[in-house]
């Protein structure tokens, strides 16, 4: 009998780096062996303009929403929209803050990012996060020489969550989708500074994740082609040929967590440690 993993979308919204949420989400999801989260991490969400596209992304791929947003107006907007969409939302810090307020008899300051010491390491992480969010999914290709790492790979190989995980450690990371038959940005072939690495997975793994991805999508997918195993095999073959041609290392993420994938990337470039 085929042992299929059930996937679900886990949306993590933070007004800071998102480390608290990532840890909480993974600690909870580890208790459910039959289901694996597809993480969508949204750090540095501090105003309505930044939040609205996040809410649209949740609507496109419904799942569990965890957030650490101290601004009451933004937190209320998240809860209201999640109720409308019929998805669960949890303000992870609110019960803890309430307990502190009751015990200490004093209100919290509700200051964004108050848990972080304002040292050089913190500002390096924020700079890396801003860079990584600006260079997600092939955006701003002319800046790749400013990156520490450029991750490439076909759709659903964990490029974005791995990029954000690295950024939370101060590593500026860009990621680019490999689309069969579509040339990669010319700047990728002329850049000299960053480590370029390709993420791959088995055909079955990618097909499963893609099938789950389109469950909540209402448009924008050629569903049959997107999950077709023969088509995915061709995409992987194309990615492997690109990497062989340019001597870019491959990392198979099939049985790796995001942390393990990030560690494998760092191991390829010791100065990133």
Swiss-Prot record:
Answer yes or no on keyword Protease: no
Q: Which reaction does it catalyse?
A: N(tele)-phospho-L-histidyl/L-threonyl-[pyruvate, phosphate dikinase] + ADP = N(tele)-phospho-L-histidyl/O-phospho-L-threonyl-[pyruvate, phosphate dikinase] + AMP + H(+); N(tele)-phospho-L-histidyl/O-phospho-L-threonyl-[pyruvate, phosphate dikinase] + phosphate + H(+) = N(tele)-phospho-L-histidyl/L-threonyl-[pyruvate, phosphate dikinase] + diphosphate
- Keywords annotated in UniProt: Kinase, Nucleotide-binding, Serine/threonine-protein kinase, Transferase
Task: Note the InterPro entries from the entry.
Answer: Kinase-pyrophosphorylase, PPDK_reg
Where on this chain does ADP bind?
Answer: 153-160
EC main class here is: transferase
The terms under GO molecular function for this entry are:
ADP binding; ATP binding; phosphotransferase activity, phosphate group as acceptor; protein serine/threonine kinase activity
EC id = 2.7.11.32, 2.7.4.27
Describe the function of this protein. Bifunctional serine/threonine kinase and phosphorylase involved in the regulation of the pyruvate, phosphate dikinase (PPDK) by catalyzing its phosphorylation/dephosphorylation.
HAMAP family xref list: PDRP
UniProt family annotation: Belongs to the pyruvate, phosphate/water dikinase regulatory protein family. PDRP subfamily.
* Protein's UniProt name: Putative pyruvate, phosphate dikinase regulatory protein
